[in-house]
Amino acid sequence: MATGSIDTGTDQLLCEVRERVAVITLNRPESRNALGDIITPALRRMIRERGEDPDVGALLITGAGTAFCAGGDVKGMANAGPAVEMTPDQKVARLKERQRTLTGALVAVRKPTVAALPGPAAGAGLAIALACDIRIVSSSAFISTGYARVGLSGDYGIVWLLTRLVGTAKARELLFTADRVDSATCERLDLVNRVVPNKTFRD
């Protein structure tokens, strides 16, 4: 039976089963829980394994510290060694597989999924939150698509996820401007289900 702490293979990702809820915590607070080459594969595996675990009834994803997830670790990408040479088709195929096994897997999980945002969610981090069934955020949280600020197009299904929730016109606005959207506005746009005061968010 899956109870207590679950070994994720890295201290960058924590997982604990509490009363049949798998609480998965992105644990890189020093980088606002940005996704990188260690945490991301571990997150994929936890989503898959806990999604298939008969002793788990729901998944909750949250972030350590004051952020949910800042998206991809852009600084880490810049400091990485030489990339493996790939054709454009190979790069597209790799990205599709990464998306399918992360946000795609979240959408497909046949159990309730909840994103609990203690603070900002941006880029791929926002996509992870949007892929969950329910989003609960602290009052100081905000979201941003972020991609336009670093000259990238949206990935991890964020275009589809946003369009499904807010419609084509608003989704395009959020993607093109990469504006910060505060928690109250997110609730008004139905991007989140509930806003919780900061002081009681972790209760």
Regions found by a protein language model. Give the residues of each.
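Conserved CoA-thioester-binding segment of acyl-CoA-metabolizing enzymes
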Residues: 1-64
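Crotonase-fold acyl-CoA enzyme core
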Residues: 37, 104-203
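Histidine-centered beta-alpha loop that forms part of the nucleotide-sugar donor binding/catalytic region
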Residues: 27, 72, 118
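Hydrophobic/aromatic residues within transmembrane alpha-helices
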Residues: 24, 61, 73, 128-129, ...
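Glycine- (often His-adjacent) and acidic-residue-rich active-site loop
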Residues: 7, 48, 63-105, 121, ...
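Amphipathic, non-transmembrane alpha-helical scaffold segments
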Residues: 36, 40, 92-96, 175
